[in-house]
Structures are given as structure tokens and as C-alpha cells.
Amino acid sequence: MGQIEWAMWANEQALASGLILITGGIVATAGRFTQWYFGAYSIAAGVLICLLEYPRGKRKKGSTMERCGQKYLTSVVKLFGPLTRNYYVRAALHFLLSVPAGFLLATILGTVCLAIASVIYLLAAIRGEQWTPIEPKPKERPQVGGTIKQPPTNPPPRPPAEVRKKPSEGEEEAASAGGPQVNPMPVTDEVV
């Protein structure tokens, strides 16, 4: 049985919690809650989390499905180097971002989800995982000369290979020289 790659689960959990934080922050800010500034903070924190978590990391084994438009954000995330690559840093960052949003009812669900993502990232870091970007594969163009095969010498319909008889040397020479061929079956022109 294969090892579980915890970072993949943490990435999905953190991205969902960022979206939940944005939604809760919009509700708190638009609804003019008494502590609406926590709602505004949740919107900003949710956007930051979504930008950080949108690019998926490359899996150790198998293939990784790249998100739509991920290559643009991947280059931005790569700029921060070890701050975004190290899962200990991500676990601490997500936990610290989740604390202020916990003081408002509209954002408490996003807070809990982000805290869970932080714990999963911590587990991934303990197991030695780290974020590596998905690099685009160079497209290999087939070489023109390597793909062309010899055309068949026998016109269709062709009998199966085991039924075909091997041409003798004399027939091969006649065929290659372009000379007349002798029909082995007698042909009669009688109409019955």
C-alpha cells in the first residue's frame, strides 16, 4: 500500500478554508456586524490563502493534475522560495492567520477549517514533504524519418502472414526489375 501524501489534502483543505473565510468576511462586513473589522481581515486573509494555495504541488509518485491557470501563480509562489516551499512555515502561517478570524461568528467555520489545514500541513512537514512546482514537460516532436515505415509491397486484400508464401529469388528479381510476371493459375476466357 502506498504512502499518503498529506500535503495534497492540506492544500485542498486550505484552499476551501480560504474561500470560506472570504465568504464569512463578506457576510460580516456587509451585514455590519459589531466587530466587522474581523470580517474585513477575513477577506484579506482568505485572498492571501487562496493565492498561496491555488498552485498544487507536484506529487512524489504519479501524475498531478494542474489547476487551470496555475502556471501563472506558480511563478509567483516560487519567488518566495523556502517561505512557501517549507510546510512548517505554511502550518504556522495558516494557524496564525486563523486566530483573529475566530472572534466572529460569521468566520468561525473558516477558522476551524484553516486550523485543520494547519495541522495537516504540520503532519506533512513531519513526514518530510515539501512543495515542489509542477514544471511543464517539454513537448517532444516525433522525428519525421523515424516514424515512416516501409509501405506494403503486396496490394490489399492481403492474406494473413502465415498463409503468405515467401517469394523465391527468381520472383523477387522479376518483381524488382519490373518485368512481366507469370500467373501460376491458368486463365480461360470461356463464358458459360
UniProtKB/Swiss-Prot annotation:
> Where are the Cytoplasmic topological domains?
2-7, 54-69, 81-86, 127-192
Stretches in topological domain Extracellular: 31-35, 105
Which residues are recorded as modified (Phosphoserine)?
A: 168, 176
Q: State its location(s).
A: Cell membrane
Q: List the disulfide bonds.
A: none
Name the InterPro entries for this protein: Cyt_b558_asu
Q: How does it sit in the membrane?
A: Multi-pass membrane protein
Q: What is this protein called?
A: Cytochrome b-245 light chain
Question: Which lineage?
Answer: Eukaryota, Metazoa, Chordata, Craniata, Vertebrata
| Gene expressing this chain | Cyba
